[in-house]
């Protein structure tokens, strides 16, 4: 895994209840269940004790998986996804819903002669999102000279047709509330990609529909796969899946 020095926060919204308070709550519930299992065991209630211990361990394990995914796992996974794109280094890349820049800046490191542009509405799906936070991370990662951020809606992108060589998105499109809005976000990604351009979307749900639609549009090399335990947000029931595809046509680079 390539190192990163920026502050990328914790995936999720913590405006009502802080991440610290939620962590304390989870720890409290887990400890209470484990303590109760001990008392049940001492009183001969073996089945109840086992169920309580399993519940306490499950709560703790789920929290640990979530923390790992948001602080470590997604960086490992996206390093591999970006490596698989085999970027030349001179592409123009767009990140839909870039947040604090975890994927945007990892991509920018691979674009010494290119440009990485991130768009976001800077809402609550990742606490502390702001253009200034992303640009501060770009400076910390030494890629500020090739990074740009815009406040923009991914369903109505402020870019001309065929503006980008690569479009990526991580855990963002699912935040659009309506199916029609999510379809429109994919339509915009399709529109702004150049012929021969590559698309990589990682998300918690809706990815199979994206893949089916891209196949119907005649896109090449459409792949849909589970990204594995490193991006389990609490467990396999909240797993992340990836869609990759290539737009029909030949890029200007050949």
Model-derived regions: residue spans:
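A short acidic, Gly/Pro-enriched loop at the edge of an enzyme's catalytic core
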Residues: 88-91, 152-167
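N-terminal auxiliary segments of SAM/dcSAM-dependent transferases
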Residues: 1-56, 64-67
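Helix-to-beta-strand junctions that scaffold the AdoMet/dcAdoMet cofactor pocket
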Residues: 111, 176-177, 193-195
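A short glycine-rich, Lys/Arg-flanked "PGG" loop and its adjoining helix->strand segment in the class I
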Residues: 182-195
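Conserved beta-strand signature within the Rossmann-like core of class I S-adenosyl-L-methionine
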Residues: 196-203
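Core SAM-dependent methyltransferase catalytic element
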Residues: 218, 222, 229-254
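Conserved class I S-adenosyl-L-methionine
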Residues: 89-99, 117
């Amino acid at each position: 895994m390539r190192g990163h020095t920026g502050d990328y926060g914790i995936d999720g919204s913590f405006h009502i209840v802080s991440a610290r308070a939620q962590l304390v709550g989870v720890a409290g519930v887990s400890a209470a269940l484990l303590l109760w299992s001990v008392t049940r065991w001492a009183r001969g209630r073996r089945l109840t004790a086992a169920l309580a211990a399993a519940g306490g361990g499950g709560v703790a394990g789920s929290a640990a998986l979530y923390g790992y995914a948001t602080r470590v796992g997604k960086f490992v996974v996206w390093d591999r996804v970006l490596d698989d794109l085999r970027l030349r280094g001179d592409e123009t890349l767009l990140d839909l819903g870039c947040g604090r820049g975890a994927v945007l800046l990892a991509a920018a490191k691979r674009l010494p002669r290119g440009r990485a542009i991130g768009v976001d509405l800077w809402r609550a799906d990742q606490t502390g999102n702001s253009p200034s936070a992303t640009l501060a991370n770009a400076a910390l990662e030494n890629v500020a000279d090739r990074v740009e951020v815009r406040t923009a809606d991914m369903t109505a992108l402020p870019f001309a047709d065929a503006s980008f060589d690569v479009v990526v998105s991580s855990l963002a499109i699912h935040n659009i509330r309506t199916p029609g809005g999510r379809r429109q976000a994919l339509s915009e990604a399709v529109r702004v990609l150049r012929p021969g351009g590559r698309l990589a979307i990682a998300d918690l749900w809706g990815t199979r529909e994206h893949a089916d639609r891209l196949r119907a549009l005649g896109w090449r090399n459409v792949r849909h796969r589970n990204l594995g335990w490193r991006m389990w947000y609490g467990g396999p029931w909240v797993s992340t899946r990836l869609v990759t595809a290539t737009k029909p046509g030949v890029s200007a680079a050949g």
